[in-house]
């Protein structure tokens, strides 16, 4: 009965938002596309400085717009500048090179769960370093080639590196995407690929270790766990067995018109963030294609409506098919409703249906550097799980200085999927990101 009520509420909100919707600071011109970790995010760069016309890749255009949004910190000058300015100056010196761009962040998160299973600790504090780099190998105007790299390192502070609060609660929705599922990993090469641009950069090909969330179901407002929502259902379409993965594969982005884009990918379903490409030989792949329509740019009434389909072969879950739809619609006031709906067969994935609906405010109190968000997600597991799980999350991100943002986060986890008994727990959180 409760599950039916949640579905009805989500459906009504989805329809009402959808009907109303129809009708940080980096002055470069390099793409920074948010991504996810075992479901984030990460950052990816690609040079667009010699783009010959206005027909740009949708994700590249979004990244340029995001880079122009001012950080708008509360504290000026930066009181932490004495410690962080040397790193910033070093990064700036490197980034002045016409061929190399780098970026570094470190994100802390502390969570306390009010209710846990017997014998499970209530609190976890952890940190994650993200290092990104992009090397422009050549640019001939109509064609270009570049290498992109993402390295991450996660650490639990004061407790065992094996502990994962989300896993211990029995959640299938990944309540802390900064860690993802499983233990902390000290060093992971999450992304390492070659990008080849063709047709005056309307067509881009990617080959190497990739992240499917970068191409399928990516949201500019509902994706980056370092600065937006922490839970996994806000990181992509969780009915994808490969959602949040980092593995060997290939992807294509094609900008068909100034408003229509097509993305497609193939990825190894046995790959992992800490693994290499050797499992490609097992021939267990996921293939997916997404088509979407967008207008505007983030911060200027951005709208994006998309649909996608996928199929996969996995080692432990068998083969399956599925699809999904998603949207975000930024209003002039800064309020931005968004939603996702994913569906799948009983095989090939651990979650066969997920619904999410929420709203962001991208300039709360007129502050462009801050962000507020709230979302509600509900999932229906495939066979073998115990409960339908729902997560309500809300956060506020305050840009304290040009180098630091922080803010509270609250998650209500209702009936974790793999818990032995049904229960509800509130996760009280605080997050801080340092931008070098």
Where are these regions (language model features)?
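Transmembrane beta-barrel strands of outer-membrane/channel proteins
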Residues: 104-110, 147-153, 205-209, 264-268, ...
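Outer-membrane beta-barrel "beta-signal"
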Residues: 424-436
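N-terminal periplasmic/intermembrane-space "pro-region" immediately following the signal or transit peptide
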Residues: 21-113, 118-120, 136-142
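Detector for outer-membrane/organellar transmembrane beta-barrel domains
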Residues: 289-382, 394
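Solvent-exposed loop/turn segments connecting transmembrane beta-strands
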Residues: 243-244, 275-283, 313-319, 343-354, ...
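Surface-exposed coil loops of outer-membrane beta-barrel proteins
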Residues: 161-193, 200-290
